[in-house]
C-alpha cells in the first residue's frame, strides 16, 4: 500500500479505481504531500468528488460551467460566489485540496499578488469618492449595467 502513494512525478493520473477508492487515494495523497488540485472532466464529476471528499477533509470547489456558450449568455451567480470563496481561501492558506472541472482548470486567473491588491474593503460610515470607486471597479474588470 505504501508504494501506491509513493509518487515521484506530478501531475499524475489515476484510473481503474471506483469512486470510494479514488476519494481515499486523493485524501491520502493530500495527507502525504499537502496541496492537491483535482481536475475532473465535467462539472458534475467535480461536484461528485467534492461532495465525497468534503465528508472526510476540508476541501475547496472551483466550479466553471462546462459550456462556453452558457458562460457568454448567463454566468451562474452561485458558481461565481463559490469560485470567489475558493480564491479567498487559497489566498489565506494554499495547503488545500481544490477540486475543479476542465473549464475551471483552463480559466484565466490573476496572480495572488494582483488578487490581493484588488481587495476592496468599505465599511459602514466610510466616506467614499464615488468617481475613484467607479474607476477602481473598472480597473478590476467590472462594467456598468443598467438595472
Label for each model-derived stretch:
Residues 1-147:
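ASCE RecA-like P-loop NTPase motor cores
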